[in-house]
Amino acid sequence: ELTSVAGSGRVDSTPLGSRGVTDLERGSFDVTVDKTNIGPLDYNLRAIKMRSKRSLSRPQAIISNCNGVNGEGPSIMVSGGPDYVTFSIKTSNTVRPAQLTIPARPGYNDVSMIYDGQNLKAKVNDIARSIPLTGKIEMRQAGLLFGACNGYANFRGEVDDFEMYECIPPFWG
């Protein structure tokens, strides 16, 4: 279930093509994660939360805004490896993306990331980490891309209960 929490909660204007089934009554839609692009991305992003289950292999792109113009890498990315999840954000104040890597277990993992303008915070299940980070998240031409990014294996697995917020949500507590 992919849910728009910010703003009106409406998802009927999200370009999914034939990859998703929209349920406007509940304000959600189900998506097969296979290079699905949701964009353009509003960079007032505060948090991403999801449950992720990936097959075990080399690092896989779960969600990012890569594959833009001029070979720019993503400024927002969540990727997963055999036993970890990596979160990265590139801001106007960094030369390279700030990254946090947190251990993950086989099967579903509760994954969340928050950038509050002062820190990048991430959590996988009950393990939380944080690093100082300031600046605006760099804009990219690409919207959010689920399941693919140049230089990474395509995501093979499942994403459940994906949520994006424009505020700091209560789940972080």
Curated annotation (Swiss-Prot):
It comes from the Eukaryota. Keywords: Secreted. Residues 1-23 are annotated as: Disordered. GO terms for cellular component: extracellular region. Component of the acid-insoluble and acid-soluble organic matrix of calcified layers of the shell (at protein level). The keyword Secreted applies. It is found in: Secreted. This is Uncharacterized shell protein 26.
